[in-house]
Amino acid sequence: MEKFEKFLEREGLLHILAEHRKRNFPEQGFKETYVRCAKSLVQVKGESALKDHFSGMPLELVASFNPYQLENKDGELQLIWRGSGIGDILVRVFHKQQKTETEYFTNKQGKVTINLDVPGDYLVNAVHMTEGAFNRGELWTSYWASMTFQIP
């Protein structure tokens, strides 16, 4: 349970721990499954207009900016859960070269503005958890949205 608790704390999901205990779920020997929802924003040579869009993944980060033509040093993302913005979710931004991690939370519409003032490679991620498939013995399912891009 200690490993599960640390994971929940790191991902901003302590409410899941409270729910786990409230339901008297077992402390050990339970299953948690996960779903990865990953995308990369890549500029194709000769293309100048990169536009991200919702592709239909269960949990998805959608950028309203083109990282290759960033006009200011901030970029807005929306975290979408099953077609609608989801609020109060931890979004972490990792910068590869600087070896930094910055944390943000989505607003009620699932939107968050992140700082992108340093050129380099970025990874943005967010995690959302739901009840698992009890008929398969899974107590929880975590959905991992991630996006990578480069700021030139």
What are these regions (language model features)?
Residues 95-97, 118, 128:
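A mature extracytoplasmic/lumenal domain signature
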Residues 133-135:
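Short, conserved, GDST-rich strand-edge loop motifs in beta-rich repeat architectures
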Residues 7-75, 80-87, 97-99, 138-152:
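Beta-strand-rich domain onsets/edges
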Residues 106-116, 120:
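Glycine-centered loop-to-beta-strand initiation motif
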